[in-house]
Amino acid sequence: GDKTLILQPSRELLIQNYCKLTSYGIPATIYSASCGKKELSNMIYATLGSIKKVVGQLKEMGIRNVLIDEAHAGYSPEDGSEFMTFMNELKPRKVIGFTATPCRLKNMSIGQTSYSQLNFITRMRPVYFKNLIHVIQVEEMIRQGFWTPLKYETWDFNGDALKLNSNGSEYTAESISEAVRKNGLNNLILRRLMILKNSCKSILVFMDSVESCNTAARWMNDHIRSGIADVVHGGTPKKQREAIVERFKSGGTQVVFNYSALGTGFDHPGLDCVIVGRPTFSFSSFYQWLGRAVRIKDGKDSALVVDCCNNSSRFGDIRELSIENYKGYGWGMFIGDKLITNIPMGDKVTKTDLDIK
């Protein structure tokens, strides 16, 4: 077949994707400095930062197809971006992107007012991906057994202290920590973990800061048993991070705390509980965090989501997410009846409103 390049935004995703393909006996190579391998072949798994330096060689080899995982993340369609410079030089024949969240956060302004909105990936300027060729809905994946059913536990949370940042895309780190402190949330999470450790085998916790992660893990290791908990963050050295993740996946470590390091693309089918221990205004972040729990595994019939900050009151139930080419409107992402793309974040537009237009 045609020679193919597969791009992914992180080292973890690259290794997962590469291992999955080669497990079927299909030969492939890795080209990524962060993986310590730089081999070209007819099927290359790569990160953009490394592979862009050998675009001339790729052209000579005749790479025809480019597959892009997490196509919404970091592949800027802006003229002159790293991605566009690479693609304009490579000139592949076919480019296919894959994503569970086909939208990009865009900061907008009208006069003095700044706001943010999620733009559908084919409804933005500039645009790179122009057509959707296949969509599978969440409810369909659940029905076909590709998505582990989620059980929700939602807590009351007083969000009065929360303040949006200047472009309205997310709460400020300071106000998140303040709200978490006022609700006494980190202690409540530890109290809940004391019970959940008896029923859940593998628990991933998102906290309001790396400092909170370290404090919580230390407390569990001191008071429950040494080695029950660990922390992964952006500054964790590569080898140490690999060892922590490996222990987590094999069941040696039961609880891993993180701020966002394991929020996207982390593949651990045995994960049966996700605790969201901080408020967020970002639908993409919330959806990705919950998405860590839906991988299927024999013997895992459901996964628990503990939404400590009542984020689902803002976004709705992600099990009702749909991607639709809505009559008279076009492509959009909906939660139930509510449109969530190409409108200012926080605004409410329903399918009924679209029908009236």
Task: Describe the predicted segments one by one.
Residues 73-151:
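Post-DEXD/H (motif II) to motif III coupling segment of the RecA-like Helicase ATP-binding lobe
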Residues 15, 30-40, 214-215, 226-260:
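Conserved helicase ATPase core of P-loop NTP-dependent helicases/translocases
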Residues 44-86, 258-260:
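Conserved RecA-like ASCE ATPase "motif II neighborhood" in helicase/translocase motors
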Residues 49-52, 72-74, 234-328:
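Conserved RecA-like P-loop NTPase helicase motor core
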Residues 22-57:
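Inter-Walker segment of RecA-like/P-loop motor cores
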Residues 130-204:
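Conserved interdomain linker/interface between the two RecA-like ATPase lobes of SF2 helicase motors
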